[in-house]
């Protein structure tokens, strides 16, 4: 038992929630509650912790993020936190979707 087996990163399209989380992680490494609060502020909707960690695990399986464990809260007696950071694949994915969105927006303007 123990660790979950990670699959080989397979290129798959990110979900809308994953794209929002990728953009949040552009700030640098963050732990789960920081990501949750930033998501809820940006999207103006609740993101339950279970849904957040399921999404983050899926993003790690896809190769978009990497988790770092064993970092303690500011005081050394705080809880061990699981931090997440973007990988180069996550950054590339975010750039690709930003370009696609810009092209789609420009195309709509020309038609409209």
Residue ranges and their predicted role:
Residues 62-78:
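Beta-hairpin "wing" of winged helix-turn-helix
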Residues 27-31, 60-62, 89-91:
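Short, charged/polar surface micro-motifs in flexible loops or helix N-caps
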Residues 1-11:
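Short, Lys/Arg-enriched N-terminal segment that forms or immediately precedes the first helix
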Residues 11-51:
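N-terminal helix-turn-helix DNA-binding core of bacterial DNA-binding proteins
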Residues 3, 89-112:
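Amphipathic alpha-helical dimerization/coiled-coil segments
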Residues 80-82:
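Short beta-strand micro-motifs in enzyme catalytic cores
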Residues 52-54, 58-59:
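Basic amphipathic alpha-helical segments that dock to polyanions
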